[in-house]
Amino acid sequence: MLEQWQIDQYHEQGYLVVNAVLTDKEVADLQADFDAWVEESRSHDAPWGDTIDGRARFDIEEDHTPEHPSLRRVTSPTEISEAFKRTALESKVAQMAGQLIGGHGARLHHSKINSKLPHTATQVKWHQDFPFTPHSNDDLVTCLLMISDVTPENGPLQVIPGSHKGTLFSHWNNERFTGYVKPEIEQEYCQNPVSCYGPSGSVCFMHTRLLHASSPNETEFPRTLFISVFAAEDALPFGENPLPSLHTGTLVWGKESGEIRSTPNTLKLPQKPKGASFFVQQAGKDSIAE
């Protein structure tokens, strides 16, 4: 489990990378399921599969072809894979997230896979997670488990250390929730990022307010992340869950307090995308406001 210096670093910098959180066998089980979904994607030319809110479970990039698959998102893999369910609800990932959140306990909010297969165009613009998942307090941790090796070259997460202590920026542009900060904010605050990478089985724990982004993968090697978001058990969610799941709200650490804790934050509630993922939202191609 985490030592105090790691917990202190997380709260000071807004992120923490820990190697060897999962065993090789645990990672191999996750990789096997994901590889099967990539193979399945070769027979599709549009997002497919069903989730509990009616949107597609599997999302593909515009450059996807049978010969060059570009599966970029699997929503709520915990619902279709025992390996992913165990990882999100019972593994050291959840326990460490609980340590970082502190307080009485922690719940799973949602989970997803974000993938960048070799030479694919998937990128993520600068944003904070909290505007997507606002709660009564901001004790939320985004846990990015590296299923594949993540290197400085294959599109790693980039973060701005300490930005979780600063402004909660608007992610609205031209009356639409686009899911990224305005260009002038990026220019002023996002010029000296730090890349987060490590061998498979590593986890980057990230505060929900931390500014982050990532670039396309232009290498021969995949970059696959299983992302689980955990919230303090006394954090009441505001608005719709963008990725609702059968496992949303599951207590993974600690106990119930029966309380709701509030901290002062001001933001406009997000629009929930109609498309398969927030990638279409960031690209301005979602039909939510049309």
Regions flagged by a language model, labelled:
Residues 134-152, 197-198, 229-232:
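Short, conserved beta-strand element in jelly-roll/cupin
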Residues 8, 150-211:
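Double-stranded beta-helix
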